[in-house]
Amino acid sequence: MAYIFVNVNRSVGTINPNIYGQFSEHLGRCIYQGIYVGQASDIPNTNGMRNDVVSALKALHVPVLRWPGGCFADTYHWRDGIGPKENRKTIVNTNWGGVTEDNSFGTHEFMELCRQIGCEAYFSGNVGSGTVQEFSDWVEYCNMGGISPMASERRANGQDEPFNVKYWGIGNEAWGCGGSMRAEYYADLCRQYSTYLRNYSPEHKIFKIASGANVADYHWTKTVMERAGQAVDAVSLHYYTVPHEDWQHKGSATDFTDEEYYTTLHKTLQMEELVENHTRIIKQYQGDRKVGLAVDEWGTWYDVEPDTNPGFLYQQNTMRDALVAAINLNIFNNHCDTICMANIAQMVNVLQAMILTEGSKMVLTPTYHIFEMYKGHQGAKQLESYAETTLLNHDDQAVPDLHVSASQQADGSILVTAANLNDTAAIPVTCMLGGAKPTGVTARVLAGAPAAHNTFAAPEQVVPAELNTSLTADGFTATLPPCSVATFVVNQ
């Protein structure tokens, strides 16, 4: 028997819905074919957006969507993607597969996608190969409600009212594909760019996010905060879970050993250390204003599926990935006092995707189901939680058998999310809710073998199911199957 303790009277704050953000890049089949098929397509669509994909994403209550990259962002010139499609410039996507990019999906199309999904837009601007003027013009084009050259151009392209885009990333991975910059050089650029990213309405202030560190590059965070911390609202962090150190042989998404399973989970758990250490640096230099941490790229990264373009980053998605998602989201929930946003990579057909498509077919991944099961945390009050765990040791890589987070809705109901990381043993759990008076409990579970996944031929191999649970005087009891994620909703 394992114990989960939740203290209803202790909280670090409200869970920002943006922690459940998504990311879509002009990469492989994420945008084209995955989301956007064009109005002439035989695949049912609304203004070019796949109806099936949009419907599935709406069910997740997606709060914010990052675009157009990724590495693509620092080669993207936004004017190439506005105006009549027949006049748009065709370019080569040099970062991802060397394919032709016709720019038929640009600013207006992306905002239409956000409108259909019901989410905020997060634009990643071009610092690597763009100019301050170009970036400044993009903000004006999107957000100026009065009379100006950019606002007039937007209206000429069919959008009278401003888009009021709130979130703006000042470059992407400036230490790498975004310009191979030193931290000192980027920090000065960030401060310069920030100066010209203006607010055009007191009711719609923009939120500026600096290009942050890769993994444990604490020098980067320190330098950016020290030199440009007063010019931004958040600093980003990128951390991918990669089973093997060799990027040419990262490991298979579906064919992996027990050792690789636990290595993947062990590396995922390192996210907490990274969040805490980068946050400590941010707080040291933020002064009298609060600067957040935006984990705007995270997720698993494996070798691509056989016989697919290596530049498309297409990979399958198993119960192992579901556990990775659950661990990360639990960590983000429990650090919601500092994490203002997180964006899993990526939404469709790329890396740890929510959705896979093949022609007119669509399949929901185990990761999709985790986001659906966890959506009740969005905007809720985080609650202090603790799991009494047993360490699972595999080649000196210890992994706890349980990983949890909890929150409380405005109506008093409590959501407890718990992952059983043990791939062979079920865990009977007793959850004690200190300060609560439970009157009822319902539960769902996502479970399966670590390599279990959904395919186009068998799309419901891994789907949520009801979980038997019993109410107690101060909580509930249940048994978590091996390799599973469960959600418990407790009414009071």
Where does each model-flagged region fall?
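Histidine-centered catalytic micro-motifs
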Residues: 237
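Active-site His/acidic residue clusters
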Residues: 240-262, 308
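Non-catalytic accessory regions flanking glycosidase/transglycosidase catalytic cores in CAZymes
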Residues: 1-234, 268-272, 276-304, 308-492
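Gly/Pro-rich active-site loop or hairpin
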Residues: 265
